[in-house]
Amino acid sequence: MDKLRLVVGLGNLGKQYAETRHNAGFKVIDRLLSLYHVQLEERNNLGEFILLRKHKVVLAKPNTYMNHSGKFVKWACQNWNIKPDKVMVVYDELAFPLGTVRLKMQGSANNHNGIKSVIAHLNTEHFNRLRFGIKSDNTSNILHEVVMSEFTPAERNLLETALTKAIEALKGYIDGVTMLKLMEVFNA
């Protein structure tokens, strides 16, 4: 299939993590699946996925813990012959306040273990990212406590706003809008 893309959301497995900030990538993928009226239909030991042939995209969530996400991303790229520059990784970003969505074409992991794993397994920093802000004024300064905390009822409106922005950006990406154009619109 010509120019297939991969959109993968990062998160942790298990009901105990489902509503945590660290699972923002999974939340975005779930919302994207809902937009296209599909579910992740296939699974292996590394992840769950669906190939949307009409849109030339694979939507996916790893079945690994965050720190091992790169194993699935590497497998998916090899399985569908997807180049790293056609990969979009969606993940939580503690450096940005909740409600913020930023796109990036390459760069370091900035202490995000899921991104560190993707970089290590793809052997490159040259892949696209959608960074979903999760920082809250009410959260601890201890990294683990912050990312494993749940969104509060007071944060629900900001969460919904950010999910809407993320879906708009990913829909553009899937529809073939260039990353530079998407960054111009969504990073403004």
Curated annotation (Swiss-Prot):
- Site described as Discriminates between blocked and unblocked aminoacyl-tRNA, located at 12
**Which residue ranges run through the membrane?**
none
Where it sits in the cell: the answer is: Cytoplasm
Q: Which UniProt keywords apply?
A: Cytoplasm, Hydrolase, RNA-binding, tRNA-binding
EC class, as a word, reads hydrolase
EC number(s) recorded for this UniProt protein: 3.1.1.29
Keyword Repeat attached: no
Q: Which GO terms describe its biological process?
A: protein quality control for misfolded or incompletely synthesized proteins; rescue of stalled ribosome
Q: Where is the active site?
A: 22
Describe the reaction catalysed, as an equation.
an N-acyl-L-alpha-aminoacyl-tRNA + H2O = an N-acyl-L-amino acid + a tRNA + H(+)
Q: Where is this site: Stabilizes the basic form of H active site to accept a proton?
A: 92
Q: Which GO terms describe its molecular function?
A: peptidyl-tRNA hydrolase activity; tRNA binding
Sorted alphabetically, the Gene Ontology cellular component annotations on this record are: cytoplasm
State the superkingdom: Bacteria
- Classification via SUPFAM superfamilies: Peptidyl-tRNA hydrolase-like
Instruction: State the Pfam families in the record.
Output: Pept_tRNA_hydro (PF01195)
Q: Where, by residue number, does tRNA bind?
A: 17, 65, 67, 113
Q: Can you tell me which family this protein belongs to? A: Belongs to the PTH family.
What is this protein's function per UniProt? Answer: Hydrolyzes ribosome-free peptidyl-tRNAs (with 1 or more amino acids incorporated), which drop off the ribosome during protein synthesis, or as a result of ribosome stalling. Catalyzes the release of premature peptidyl moieties from peptidyl-tRNA molecules trapped in stalled 50S ribosomal subunits, and thus maintains levels of free tRNAs and 50S ribosomes.
Q: How does it assemble?
A: Monomer.
- What is this protein's name? Peptidyl-tRNA hydrolase
Organism in which the protein naturally occurs = Mycoplasma pneumoniae (strain ATCC 29342 / M129 / Subtype 1) (Mycoplasmoides pneumoniae)
